[in-house]
Amino acid sequence: FGFAVADPGSIYINRGNHEDMTVCTGYGFVDELVNKFSQNTAGRHLLAIIDTIFSLLPLVHVIDENIAVVHGGISDKFDLDSLKAINRRLYRTLTGLPQAITHDENGKDDEGHTHRDWSVLMDCLWSDPAPVSERFPGELKCKSNDERGGGVLWSEQFTKEWLSQHKLGCLIRSHECQDEGYKTHHEGRVLTLFSASNYYGEDEENDGAILVLSPLQDPPGKLLTYSTCYAKGGYEKLRTAELAGKMESAALARVEVCL
C-alpha cells in the first residue's frame, strides 16, 4: 500500500481471498492492528478504512491485452464484462455473509447483496485449476471446490475456452503455495505465482517467485525465485512488536526513496 501511494501509476494491487475482514480476524491481521493501536478510536477508525479499501480493490488486471492476473481463478459463471458490472464495494466480506445469500440461489437482501454476485466473487478469489487427472461429470468443465469449501475447480478445456473468448494468451494467479514459488498448469496457459517464501515457517520451507515481464526480453517473461535467509543457528524468535519494527522500518525506508 505504501508503494501504491508513493507511485500510483506503477503499483497495482488485486484483491485476494484474505482481503476480507472475516478472514483477517482468523489469521491474525486484526489482532496485529489491535496490538499496535489498541482498541481506541484510532484503531477502530483504521480497521474501518482498511475494510473499505479491501472492498474497493480490483479483482482482475489485464496486461497488454494478453495476460489476465487474478488471485484465485476463473469459472463458467462470469466473463470479464460481467465482473465489471458487480458493485464489489458491497462485498466487504464473502465468508461472513448470512446463509440467505450464500445458500439460496435466488438469495438477495435489502443491502444489495445477491447470491449470484457473491458466487462470482467467490469463484474469482477461491478457485483452483484442476490437475489433468481430475474427472468432471458429464460435460461439466467446472465443479465445486470441495477441499476449500468455496470457488471451483476448472478444467484445462475451460482454460482454453475462457482465454479464447477473451482473446488472451495466459492466466496468472496465486492462491496456492508452491515448493519452487511457481507452477504451470494446463499446457502452460495458467501460471501459479506465489511470492511469499517459507510461507508456513520452519516446518515447511518453500521458495518465493516473481515474474518479470518486458516486451524487450526474449522470451518476454522471466521467472525469478528466492528464499528468505535465516541467520546461522536457526530462526530468531521475535515478539510481534520486534518483528513489526524490523520489517516495517525496512519497508518505510524503501517507500521514502520512492517519495
PLM segments and residue spans:
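Feature recognizes metal-dependent phosphohydrolase scaffolds
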Residues: 1-259
